[in-house]
Amino acid sequence: MACRIAIDGPAGSGKTTVARLVAQRLGISYLDTGAMYRIVGLHLSRKGANVKSSSLKDYLKDLRIEYTDGNFYVNGTPVGEEIRTPEAGMYASLYAAHPDVREFLTRIQKEICKERNIVAEGRDIGTVVIPDAEVKIFLVASPEVRAKRRYFELIAKGYKVQYEDVLREIIERDQNDSKRDIAPLSKAVDAVEIDTSDLSIEEVVDMIIKLVRERCWEKF
Ligand code: C5P
């Protein structure tokens, strides 16, 4: 049986860094589902798709997202840093509330996670994508801590951003993601919650690895 590790939580909770390290330490695959919502968000915004439209299916027909060795390809072209901007994050969050977008990406994600050892991170992994995951983690941290992390991350990448704007964007995205009707950001009843506000990345990774060894003892 495969060992599937679901890591969910709000923007800046440390999901991406932690999930990547856990996958690396265990030597298994890693899936960043937020990247997929960013890809679709950018695609739809470039096409001028109205988020309130009853159907977005036509816009998604010509979009082929592939995932190979931890990298995404859109219609054969590798995806780069363009999906990491704050705007791409906002588009992702806006279009992620649309049922057609969720159906489109959930189907691909379920397929990627099928019968394979994987760490998948996002907002609805433990509730929708892998509801029967062997290990479910829900990471939390205060909005200020999360905004500070995102701020330093963006500055390091050369973006000229203000802390206050990053904090506002984080709070806005939290609201979009928690209040939407379909697959909102929420903790699965059987998920283990970890508050990362005062923990180092290594401490969080160690806690998760310990849980994985308990639940998937025959593999690791
Ligand atoms: O994780 P990241 O911040 O890159 O995700 C960008 C956006 O994609 C989130 O704010 C959320 O709206 C959406 N998302 C989602 N479900 C997921 C992953 C991301 O709705 N599983």
List the model feature ranges, each with a label.
Residues 7:
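Hydrophobic anchor at the beta1->P-loop junction of P-loop NTPases
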Residues 10:
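P-loop (Walker A) phosphate-binding loop of NTP-binding proteins
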Residues 18:
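Hydrophobic positions on the alpha1 helix immediately C-terminal to the Walker A/P-loop
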Residues 24-86:
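N-terminal phosphate/diphosphate-binding loop that engages ATP/GTP or pyrophosphate donors
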Residues 59, 69, 109-115, 123, ...:
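Small-molecule kinase domains that catalyze NTP-dependent phosphoryl transfer to phosphate-bearing small molecules
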